[in-house]
């Protein structure tokens, strides 16, 4: 007959030191206690009969119940943590050193992102970029290649091919600072191949499961069904990425091959397009231009009903912005339209003369159609109209006063001037992207009233007045004209740390240099530091 004291002594002999070994895993301790109680209850039942068994059963049941409750709580907490971790894995912050074009995390379930790596082992930043953010960052690095001696002999295609190789990255790493401030980013060239192999493996296993055949038979059947001269297609998961990359390359080859020589009053050097330059533009750009009155133009050019039907049917495309304002002049990018974008034909310059003095009506102050036939004006006109047609727009808004400016099909193209900015400005709802020498730029405009001083434009920092009267009307500048003439030190400060990038008393040599990527000497961030938001100017009053 076993001695009950021995079983109690066995309990006392159990290790329970002051370091809390039993308390490290609460659920495990409760489960162990329940098991010990059940064993002790069984021993007492065998020794003392039914009474002892009846007395031991409640103790064993209570201990076992406590252990089960603790284990259930632990399992529930673990499941909740796993679910939260799963949701967090589907998104990651964008790792671009520049400003994120989307302002939201990267959705890892989609196929529009790129992986990058930082050479800092303890980098806390993300390793994922939106595909568009990666292209913008890559284009900003390409701009800096023009300043490097060994890379000056490379063309754009060679720069893109060599950038992430060893010889190219040895030159480019200085422009690839990571947000952590202690490392440099680099494109993960192995990631896409690994992902592609995984997608192919998943597709192959999925097709074998669907057919219900052994893997060998399925592979042989696929080979038999495949045409002999037709190349093998890639996996369907790679199609969106391939389409986006092909579209990016085609746009850069067709549209971004040249920077046009729009005359800058400060002597900024113009650049001419290369020989054999071709532009992607609608056929009616080069054909005969028929006369069209304003009423007929508005009736044919406004496509409000297709927009409303598309919105009601849920056909909302990515990066699409719709404007149903009373003006109703804008034809936005909202899908595939059969009707080409139509631009207004300027009958005379009487409307422009109401905003400028008569002595300024000459080819120096206003870009004329006759002047365009002499130089590169025809290519410039096609470039602008092609970019607007691709975005389905025939009206632009002033960046300062937001006045609607119809675009004409002849010079002067607008009652104001157009310019390209490397940054996407949120103050303007629509976006007209275009590629210029491999750089992604955005087309904006300033109206003639803001340029000529009819509207008083002041800087919100120093309260000084902005003067745009020296700009040529009706043409396009290949840089941000609002950033080209900084009035105070605040316009030359870093966008991240707020410290001065350069001294305002020194400035830059050319107007276009203010629209280039600069590196802050204090925090090391690469950005378009001098391209400030349009809201940094204020329309104080209109005379």
Swiss-Prot record:
A cellular component term, taken from the record's GO annotations: nucleus
Tissues with expression: Expressed in all tissues examined. Highest levels are in the spleen, thymus, peripheral blood and heart. Lowest in the kidney and pancreas.
Basic and acidic residues biased stretches: 197-211, 235-250
Region Disordered, annotated ranges: 1-26, 197-283
Modified residues (Phosphoserine): 264, 268
Family matches, as InterPro entries: Headcase, Headcase_mid, HECA_N
Pfam families hit by this protein: Headcase, HECA_N
Alphabetical GO biological process terms: negative regulation of mitotic cell cycle; respiratory tube development
Key words, A-Z: Developmental protein, Phosphoprotein
PANTHER family from the UniProt entry: HEADCASE PROTEIN (PTHR13425), HEADCASE PROTEIN HOMOLOG (PTHR13425:SF3)
Cited function: May play an important role in some human cancers. May be part of the regulatory mechanism in the development of epithelial tube networks such as the circulatory system and lungs.
Protein name per its UniProtKB record: Headcase protein homolog
Organism: Homo sapiens (Human)
């Amino acid at each position: 007959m076993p001695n009950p004291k021995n079983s109690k002594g066995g309990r006392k002999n159990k290790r329970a030191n002051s370091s809390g070994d039993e308390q490290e895993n609460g659920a495990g301790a409760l489960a162990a206690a329940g098991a010990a109680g059940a064993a002790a209850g069984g021993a007492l039942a065998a020794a003392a009969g039914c009474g002892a068994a009846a007395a031991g059963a409640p103790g064993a049941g209570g201990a076992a119940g406590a252990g089960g409750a603790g284990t259930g709580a632990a399992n529930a907490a673990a499941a909740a943590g796993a679910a939260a971790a799963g949701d967090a894995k589907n998104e990651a912050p964008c790792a671009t050193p520049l400003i994120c074009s989307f302002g939201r995390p990267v959705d890892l379930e989609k196929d529009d992102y790129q992986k990058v790596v930082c050479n800092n082992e303890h980098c806390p930043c993300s390793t994922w970029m939106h595909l568009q953010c990666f292209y913008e960052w890559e284009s900003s690095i390409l701009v800096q290649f023009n300043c490097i001696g060994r890379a000056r002999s490379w063309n754009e295609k060679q720069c893109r091919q060599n950038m992430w190789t060893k010889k190219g990255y040895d030159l480019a790493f200085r422009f690839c600072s990571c947000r952590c401030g202690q490392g440099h980013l680099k494109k993960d060239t192995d990631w896409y191949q690994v992902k592609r192999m995984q997608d192919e493996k998943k597709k192959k296993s999925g097709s074998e499961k669907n057919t219900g055949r052994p893997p060998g038979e399925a592979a042989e059947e696929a080979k038999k069904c495949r045409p002999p001269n037709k190349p093998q297609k890639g996996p369907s998961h790679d199609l969106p990425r391939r389409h986006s990359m092909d579209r990016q390359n085609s746009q850069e080859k067709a549209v971004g091959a040249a920077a046009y020589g729009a005359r800058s009053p400060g002597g900024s050097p113009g650049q001419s397009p290369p020989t054999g330059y071709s532009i992607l533009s609608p056929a009616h750009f080069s054909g005969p231009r028929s006369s069209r009155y304003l009423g007929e133009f508005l009736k044919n050019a406004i496509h409000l009903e297709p927009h409303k039907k598309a919105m009601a049917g849920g056909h909302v495309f990515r990066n699409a912005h719709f404007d149903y304002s009373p003006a109703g002049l804008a034809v936005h990018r909202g899908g595939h339209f059969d009707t080409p974008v139509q631009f207004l034909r300027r009958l005379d310059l009487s409307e422009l003369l109401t905003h400028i003095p008569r002595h300024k009506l000459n080819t120096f102050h206003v870009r004329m159609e006759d002047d365009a036939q002499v130089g590169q004006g025809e290519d410039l006109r096609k470039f602008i109209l092609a970019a607007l047609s691709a975005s389905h727009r025939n009206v632009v808004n002033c960046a300062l006063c937001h006045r609607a400016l119809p675009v004409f099909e002849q010079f002067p193209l607008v009652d104001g001037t157009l310019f390209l900015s490397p940054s996407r400005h949120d103050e303007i709802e629509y976006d007209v992207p275009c590629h210029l020498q491999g750089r992604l730029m955005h087309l904006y405009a300033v109206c003639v009233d803001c340029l000529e001083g009819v509207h008083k434009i002041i800087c919100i920092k120093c309260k000084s007045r902005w003067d745009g009267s020296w700009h040529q009307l009706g043409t396009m500048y290949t840089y941000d004209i609002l950033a080209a003439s900084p009035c105070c030190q605040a316009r030359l400060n870093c966008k991240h740390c707020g410290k001065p990038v350069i001294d305002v008393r020194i400035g830059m040599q050319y107007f276009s240099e203010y629209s280039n990527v600069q590196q802050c000497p204090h925090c090391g961030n690469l950005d378009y530091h001098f391209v400030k938001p349009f809201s940094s100017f204020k329309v104080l009053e209109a005379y």
